[in-house]
Amino acid sequence: MDSISFSFLLYEAYCVALYLVLPTVPSPASTRPCLKPLHRDVVVRTSWSVFLPAAFLFAFIDMVIDPVALRGDRWFLGKIYYYPDPGIHSGVPFANYVGWAVVGLISLAIYFPLERRLPALTPPQSVTPRLLPGVGLYYGVLVFDLGVTFWIDESFMGMSGLLMHLSVIVLLMVRLAGPHGLSPSG
């Protein structure tokens, strides 16, 4: 994979991690938007609670991308690479995923101190609209790769990729549009 793709996938994974972790902005019951407004908090944005999930999500999406890319000769990608010692995960060695996680951790370790030093902006109260494109791209890549996986008749590989990501998808959906908090009924 080229270095630009790494950057985009890391940005997308970072957006998903932020969406899962950033605090919500309280809003009156009468003006609640359909998507939860998230507060831009530089301390949270550059904390371990974002750092580790972002690196994990970066390597996690590769667990769907690489097995189908390895079979590029069966679809329009073509045979672009191979592993001399195929791994147990659909032919991809585990070291590949460790490498992705390490690249993600190093990249974020460089970015986070820079983010903390940037001058404070006066962004809108909610950063939800700014995160949605990254979240959408992450899941767009996932849907594309799963679609190709099923299209080339790799049903087991496709189902395992779907099931691996299902828990994160459910958490994200609850976070995106789930209950805005319990209100006392009375």
Question: Residue spans of the language-model regions?
Answer:
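Aromatic-rich, lipid-facing transmembrane alpha helices and their immediate juxtamembrane interface loops
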Residues: 1-186
